[in-house]
């Protein structure tokens, strides 16, 4: 399989269709191609946690992380999301790229940890940040992901929550490594957004056992 360069990966991910009507309650914000490419490229090149691995993508939305992981040679990548509309777009994206190593399951992510215990080598995710009406969602996603992964979980979290996450990781006896600090360009998708876009500082974190 041809090795993709970072720029090539980002360029391909720019062709992935995103949410048509994002749902505020589900905190649906797209993972920008640049962020997705940097995240996946680091996981692949630095830690070798994608190629030929079983990968889960929690709260996968329209599938940008799953599709990127598939392009980098994942054995199988399975996306999980509660939203049927997002998964429909995800499915179209997979068909357009003619990928055979991607699957998707509609479900409530919270119901997964018991059913999917340690079934995946790697879990990747850009969870809801748990702001607005969904306090604690990010940590609930993380807890589920840790139950599903055999090797590592890679997740994006607001840098402002770093201390809280470090405490939780210690409590759960999980190793934690901040592997990148990124600027997340959050576009104005909802009516309450006053600015066209806002930059949020996020950490790409690796959790391992």
Curated annotation (Swiss-Prot):
It catalyses: adenosine(1832) in 18S rRNA + S-adenosyl-L-methionine = N(6)-methyladenosine(1832) in 18S rRNA + S-adenosyl-L-homocysteine + H(+). It is an enzyme of class 2 (transferase). Disruption phenotype: Mice were born at non-Mendelian rates and develop morphological, such as craniofacial abnormalities, snout deviation due to altered nasal bone development and incomplete fusion of the frontal bone suture. Mice display reduced body size and evidence of metabolic defects. Mice also show behavioral abnormalities. Deletion in embryonic stem cells (ESCs) results in a decrease in global translation rate, spontaneous loss of pluripotency and compromised differentiation potential. Cells show abolished level of N6-methylation of adenine(1832) in 18S rRNA. Ubiquitously expressed in brain. GO terms for cellular component: cell projection; cytosol; fibrillar center; nucleus; postsynapse; presynapse. GO terms for molecular function: nucleic acid binding; rRNA (adenine-N6-)-methyltransferase activity; S-adenosyl-L-methionine binding. Its EC number is 2.1.1.-. CDD domains: AdoMet_MTases. It is found in: Nucleus; Presynapse; Postsynapse. Keywords: Cell projection, Methyltransferase, Nucleus, S-adenosyl-L-methionine, Synapse, Transferase. GO terms for biological process: positive regulation of translation; rRNA methylation; stem cell differentiation. Pfam families: MTS. S-adenosyl-L-methionine binds at residues 28, 31, 59, 62, 64, 81, 108-109. rRNA N6-adenosine-methyltransferase activity is inhibited by zinc. Catalytic subunit of a heterodimer with TRMT112, which specifically methylates the 6th position of adenine in position 1832 of 18S rRNA. N6-methylation of adenine(1832) in 18S rRNA resides in the decoding center of 18S rRNA and is required for translation and embryonic stem cells (ESCs) pluripotency and differentiation. Heterodimer; heterodimerizes with TRMT112. Belongs to the methyltransferase superfamily. PrmA family. This is rRNA N(6)-adenosine-methyltransferase METTL5. The lineage of its organism: Eukaryota, Metazoa, Chordata, Craniata, Vertebrata. The gene is Mettl5.
